[in-house]
Regions:
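Physicochemical signature of membrane-embedded alpha-helices that form the seven-helix bundle of GPCRs
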Residues: 50, 54-57, 87, 120-123, ...
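Juxtamembrane boundary at the C-terminal end of a transmembrane helix
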Residues: 177-187
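Acidic interhelical loop/turn segments
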Residues: 141-160
C-alpha cells in the first residue's frame, strides 16, 4: 500500500508558491561553500568540463522529460514538471556559479567570452526563474480547475503554449552552451 501521507506532503510542497524559494535558498548556500572550497581551486580546463557536463545533463533531462515523455495525465504531468523545475533551480545555480568563475578566469587571463555563450548560459536560468515564479503556479491553478470541473479554462492552452515556448528556448540555450563548452575541450 502506497504511503499517501508522503505523496500528499510532496504534492503540497510542489504546489506551494514558495517552493522555488525553498529550493533556491539552500542551493545558493551549498553553492557558496562549493565555490569557496572547490571551484576557486579548480583548473580552467576542469571548469570547462564541468560546464559542459552541467549543460549537457540539463539539456538531456529537459528534452526528455518536457518533450519526449509529454503525453501525461494532467495531475501526473503537473507534479512531474514541478519536480523538474525544482531540480532545474539547483542545476541552474550550479551552472551560473561555474560560469561566473570560468568567465572571471578567462577575463583575468585577457581572454574573451562571446555574447552568444554568455546568453546561452543566462537564458536557461532566466527561463527557469520565470517558470517557477509565474508559469507553473498559473498552470497548477488551471490544472486543478480542470480536475475539479472537467472543463478547460480558455487561458490554459495559452499558458501551456507559453510554457512549451519557454522550454524550447531553454533547450536551445542549453544545447548551444553544452556544444560550445564541449568544443572548447577538444581544442
Amino acid at each position: 500500500m502506497p504511503n499517501t501521507s508522503f505523496s500528499n506532503c510532496c504534492a503540497r510542497f510542489l504546489e506551494d508558491p514558495l517552493a522555488a524559494v525553498k529550493v533556491l535558498v539552500p542551493s545558493v548556500a551549498i553553492e557558496i561553500v562549493l565555490h569557496k572550497k572547490l571551484w576557486q581551486k579548480t583548473s580552467l580546463r576542469d571548469l570547462t568540463l564541468y560546464l559542459a557536463i552541467v549543460n549537457t545533463y540539463w539539456f538531456a533531462t529537459t528534452l526528455n522529460l518536457s518533450f519526449l515523455e509529454t503525453p501525461l495525465f494532467c495531475n501526473c504531468g503537473r507534479q512531474r514538471f514541478n519536480w523538474l523545475n525544482k531540480i532545474e533551480i539547483v542545476v541552474g545555480v550550479l551552472g551560473l556559479d561555474l560560469y561566473c568563475e570560468w568567465r572571471k578566469r578567462i577575463i583575468d587571463n585577457n581572454g574573451f567570452v562571446d555574447g552568444v555563450l554568455a546568453r546561452s548560459i543566462w537564458i536557461p536560468a532566466t527561463v527557469t526563474a520565470i517558470q517557477a515564479v509565474y508559469l507553473l503556479p498559473t498552470l497548477n491553478k488551471k490544472a486543478k480547475q480542470i480536475d475539479r470541473t472537467g472543463h478547460e479554462d480558455e487561458q490554459f492552452p495559452k499558458a501551456h503554449r507559453a510554457y512549451i515556448g519557454f522550454e524550447t528556448v531553454k533547450v536551445v540555450g542549453l544545447a548551444v552552451a553544452g556544444l560550445r563548452f564541449g568544443r572548447m575541450l577538444t581544442l
